[in-house]
From Swiss-Prot:
GO terms for cellular component: cytosolic large ribosomal subunit. This is Large ribosomal subunit protein uL14. InterPro entries: Ribosomal_uL14 (IPR000218), Ribosomal_uL14_bac-type (IPR005745), Ribosomal_uL14_CS (IPR019972), Ribosomal_uL14_sf (IPR036853). The gene is rplN. Belongs to the universal ribosomal protein uL14 family. PROSITE patterns: RIBOSOMAL_L14. NCBIfam families: rplN_bact. It comes from Rhizobium meliloti (strain 1021) (Ensifer meliloti). SUPFAM superfamilies: Ribosomal protein L14.
Amino acid sequence: MIQMQTNLDVADNSGARRVMCIKVLGGSKRKYASIGDIIVVSIKEAIPRGRVKKGDVMKAVVVRTAKDIRRADGSVIRFDTNAAVLIDNKKEPIGTRIFGPVPRELRAKNHMKIISLAPEVL
């Protein structure tokens, strides 16, 4: 459950380390984003010589949330941290690697490139 002002870790090698959500896309009154949703983020911390720099405004896909995700079979999945992957306007990841596990709910939201780059799909 990501809302405005939420800080997230970046789960790719785009050069950003931490980002802050500044908008949840998908409707004018939408308050919260969950896994697979697209948000607008501001880069708060970045490494030198990365593809992005501090202060850049980008779009990102939420890949991990600390809030539970309930599945159709009744199981629940949750992560320790909130994390996102930076994307471009064509919804392709900016980085070439994804760090950490991602849930298979991303497949239903058509983020296949992120699924294929991830080392583990839960």
